[in-house]
A protein has these predicted regions:
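C-terminal regulatory domains involved in ligand/effector binding and gene-expression control
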Residues: 1-77, 164, 200-204
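Terminal, non-globular segments
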Residues: 175, 181-182
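N-terminal positively charged helical leader segments and presequences
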Residues: 167-169
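Terminal alpha-helical anchor/extension segments at protein ends
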Residues: 114, 120-125, 140, 193-204
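Short amphipathic alpha-helices in soluble, non-transmembrane regions
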Residues: 151-157, 184-193
């Protein structure tokens, strides 16, 4: 995906259902480790809760390698899965949902739990503000000092930026560009430098 929506700010929704209190929290989490860290922070804030059920889409919305969920002691399939279904249906990426349940003494039944957990995430998503993320790919570029201002202007035209500059006899730049703009920038760079400059991919 060239770009996707991510949470712009965290959301908290509190609901009481049959004497149980459900607290739904959404947050931006860039990657699985960030998702796990957010879950642990919620556990620390609510140590006395009966359940801390979880779902995350930790990468791009279509990245199935970064999905996760947990029922945390609720009957299998009644919490994490309906929560994840809501997240996946939203089209938002890099997002984690935690629903904290303080048990009130009344059983909700399987259908009631699915509705409570999925419904809590649905309510929170309706309150969520988002922003668009365009991932950037990094390259190196070697240029003369006299070419630097022109390169900065070209990067600006292509939504790119300079990550790092190393000033020696020449300038070694580390630049970042959206994938969709690389061909355009390369063409502009060739025109600007009369073919003497080119982007070099960074080997992992």
């Amino acid at each position: 995906m060239e770009s996707w929506l991510i949470p712009a700010a965290p959301v908290t929704v509190v609901e009481e259902i049959k004497k149980s209190r459900f607290i739904t929290l959404l947050a931006h989490t860039d990657g699985v480790e960030a998702a796990k860290a957010f879950v642990e922070s919620v556990r620390a804030e609510h140590p006395d809760a009966r359940h801390h059920c979880v779902a995350w889409v930790a990468g791009a919305p279509d990245d199935s390698q970064q999905l996760g969920f947990s029922d945390d002691g609720e009957p299998a399939g009644t919490a994490g899965k309906p929560m994840l279904a809501q997240l996946m249906g939203s089209g938002v990426g890099e997002i984690t949902a935690v629903v904290v349940r303080y048990y009130g003494g009344m059983l909700l039944g399987t259908g009631g739990l699915v509705k409570a957990y999925g419904g809590g995430v649905n309510q929170a998503l309706r309150q969520l503000t988002t922003q668009r993320k365009t991932p950037l790919t990094e390259y190196t570029l070697q240029c003369e000092y006299s070419q630097l201002t022109g390169i900065e202007a070209l990067l600006g035209q292509c939504d790119g930026k300079i990550i790092n500059s190393d000033y020696q006899a020449f300038v070694l730049l580390r630049v970042a560009l959206p994938a969709a703009k690389v061909a355009e920038f390369s063409a502009k760079l060739a025109d600007f430098s009369r073919g003497s400059l080119q982007l070099l991919a960074i080997e992992e």
